[in-house]
Amino acid sequence: MSEKNKLAEKLLYAPKNGYDRLSAEDEKAMEAYCEDYKKFLNNGKTERLCVEYCIELAEKKGFKAYEAGMKLSAGDKVYFNNRGKGIMLAVIGSEDLSHGANIGAAHTDSPRLDLKPRPLYEEAEMAYFKTHHYGGIRKYQWVTIPLELHGVVVLHDGSKVDVHIGGKEDDPQFIINDLLPHLGREQGKKPLNEAIPSESLNVLLGGKPFEDKDCSDRFKLGVLQYLNAQYGITEEDFISAELEVVPAGKARDIGFDRSFIASYGHDDRVCAYAELAGIFDAVSPKKTAVCIFADKEEIGSEGVSGMLSQAFEWFMGDMCRTQGVALSDCFANSFCLSADVTAAYDPNFADVYDKRNSAFVNYGVALCKYTGSGGKGGASDASAEVVGKVRKLMNDNGVFWQMAEMGKTDAGG
């Protein structure tokens, strides 16, 4: 090797495609991991379903439900179910919590359509649900695609029923109508974010009337008759329901080489599953390992199941109390990775990316030093020390990684 090449290899940063670095054994392990990830996506279409599936997997790995004041020893595995919408898991370390914990945090809620409190109506002899979109959806992506309905309904007597329609092969599914091209001239002149108004995101439910020709609202009543027979639901019960409309279908491999996965919910279940797999592999950690599945990130992390609640502090604080440790001491010595998705460079939309500071497909996990928009507005900006620690950790353990921002400074954030 020439002196020039030696110097270039020593001084220049030259990321490489992961496929050029993977051994055959590593590639086989990666493919097995992706198959398990697809199962997670298929079983976790909503934040509630993610929690249920997480508990199912965790209990198979020896995790037990955490109870207040529970005495824990090194190696114990516990989970705390936060109202069925969030979950935290911990593997107790050999050091007490005064030395802190290593924490991974991701969210399992994804953009979707929620039903309004009084959603059911009929118009032009068809039955519909009114929706209120949750999080930052691209509205045009939600019309004319098959949809599923998942959630819970608390009935008038206080009992709760689970509703899951559209996920099984023989289930009916739902759809939101759009204009046909022949009548869409004026719609086509509108900006993309205005062409499909939020109030037009009405889910088509059916067009078969109730048998009695003399009753009013025959089509609405036909839907209620079905829901009452299957679930015991009346119209008033929608007021105390959490019903979510999500895209139908299972995760699928994409490409002749099956090198991509298409699915609803990558944001942020791709990170949630990674940290879950990580804590399942944690064996006799020195510091306690903690995994967080948070809810409500898409709308600001509010509410009792979001990260702005006291749920995480309660879980950590209660474990600290059993060890006689102050929660503040634990947090002062803890380390946390907040895991969420970013945007990989897409040549079809190259104008919104800073190519030199973008993530690229197959170049490894994307690390983002800061978030925010514009001039780092609202950013969480990691220090050089934190980035250096994570960078060294990745390199020392053979993890493929890359640094990334989300697009050009003025493009969004």
Question: Which ranges hold each PLM region?
Answer:
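N-terminal hydrophobic/helix-forming segments and targeting peptides
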Residues: 1-413
